[in-house]
């Protein structure tokens, strides 16, 4: 009884996360500004991490947790890089005294 109830909730959560991911990907493509696209990319990566975590529960393995960490790192670095590009027009500052 508990197993079927758990399977039902995990399956329904995966379906809802899939729908949410499709909606965020639509917004990522259609977003009016670059800032909207950055926020949407961050939300899509969080949804993707949740889906991978649920799949890790379904398959009963810990091997997917490395991919969750990789998605989080890529999401963080890309969000910071794009935000710096929007703010100043460049990601790396060539006039920084620490680079000399």
UniProtKB/Swiss-Prot annotation:
May form a heterooligomeric complex that consists of seven subunits: mnhA2, mnhB2, mnhC2, mnhD2, mnhE2, mnhF2 and mnhG2. The lineage of its organism: Bacteria, Bacillati, Bacillota, Bacilli, Bacillales. It comes from Staphylococcus saprophyticus subsp. saprophyticus (strain ATCC 15305 / DSM 20229 / NCIMB 8711 / NCTC 7292 / S-41). Pfam families: MrpF_PhaF. This is Putative antiporter subunit mnhF2. GO terms for molecular function: sodium:proton antiporter activity. One of its GO terms (cellular component) is plasma membrane. The keyword Translocase does not apply. Disulfide bonds: none annotated. Belongs to the CPA3 antiporters (TC 2.A.63) subunit F family. It is found in: Cell membrane. Keywords: Antiport, Cell membrane, Ion transport, Membrane, Transmembrane, Transmembrane helix, Transport. The chain crosses the membrane at residues 6-26, 38-60, 64-86. It is a multi-pass membrane protein.
């Amino acid at each position: 009884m508990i197993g079927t109830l758990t399977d039902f909730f995990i399956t329904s959560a995966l379906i809802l996360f899939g729908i949410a991911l499709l909606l965020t990907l639509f917004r990522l493509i259609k977003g009016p500004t670059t800032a909207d696209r950055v926020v949407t990319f961050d939300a899509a990566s969080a949804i993707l991490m949740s889906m991978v975590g649920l799949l890790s529960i379904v398959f009963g393995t810990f091997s997917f947790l490395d991919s969750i960490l990789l998605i989080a790192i890529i999401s963080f670095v890309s969000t910071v890089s794009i935000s710096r590009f929007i703010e100043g027009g460049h990601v790396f500052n060539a006039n920084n005294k620490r680079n000399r």
